[in-house]
Structures are given as C-alpha cells and as structure tokens.
Amino acid sequence: MNLINIIENSQKKSNITKLFSGDIVKINIWVLEGNKKRIQIFEGIIIAIKNKGISSSITVRKISNGEGVERMFPLHSPIIESIIVNRHSLVRKSKLYYLRNKKGRSSRIKQRLKK
C-alpha cells in the first residue's frame, strides 16, 4: 500500500456524520486561551463542502451582530470536538454562495421534512 494512504488513514476520523449543503450545524471547537482549554460553539449554515479525503472541509456561515461570519473547518482536524446537525434544509445547489448577498428573511431556506 502507498505510504501516503497509510498515513492519511491513520489520521482520519471515523465518527463524522453525513453532512449536506444547507444543513444548520453546531460545531464544538477546542480553543486555547492562555494556558486554559475550553470548547467554543460555532452555529451556522453549511454553504460549501469540499470532499478531498483527509483534507475535506466545510464552510459554515452565520450572522453575528448583523455581520456575516464565514469560517472554514477541516473535517478531520483535532480541534473539532463534535459536529451536530440541528436541521436539514431543502436546497438544490451544492454551493450556497448566493446567501452572501441576501439579507433578512430572503436569506432563509426551507426545511427538509422527513418522510
């Protein structure tokens, strides 16, 4: 087997939930402040997913104090404690970059109902 594949497989997390564009997620992240370590929660909508093996990442957008905040998270990073899916949304595109230009109620996305 290829040496790179062996190293990548040892670094991959196996407990990652299935994520889709448009999902509202809550990501718990380990943050270092001085010599203390705590968990910070980042909650928002997934606007992009890049699946590239161990370097897979998601882009999450939230509105904080009226300003849009986007953050990219590598899925297999050790700073991510957990990813919790709060809600699935009904979208027809894989990249939701058009949400950057929307404000208020126009930026809302319909919820996907389970059958």
Swiss-Prot record:
PROSITE patterns: RIBOSOMAL_L19. Keywords: Ribonucleoprotein, Ribosomal protein. GO terms for biological process: translation. InterPro entries: Ribosomal_bL19, Ribosomal_bL19_CS, Ribosomal_bL19_sf, Translation_prot_SH3-like_sf. SUPFAM superfamilies: Translation proteins SH3-like domain (SSF50104). One of its GO terms (cellular component) is ribosome. One of its GO terms (molecular function) is structural constituent of ribosome. Belongs to the bacterial ribosomal protein bL19 family. This protein is located at the 30S-50S ribosomal subunit interface and may play a role in the structure and function of the aminoacyl-tRNA binding site. NCBIfam families: rplS_bact. This is Large ribosomal subunit protein bL19. It comes from Wigglesworthia glossinidia brevipalpis. The lineage of its organism: Bacteria, Pseudomonadati, Pseudomonadota, Gammaproteobacteria, Enterobacterales.
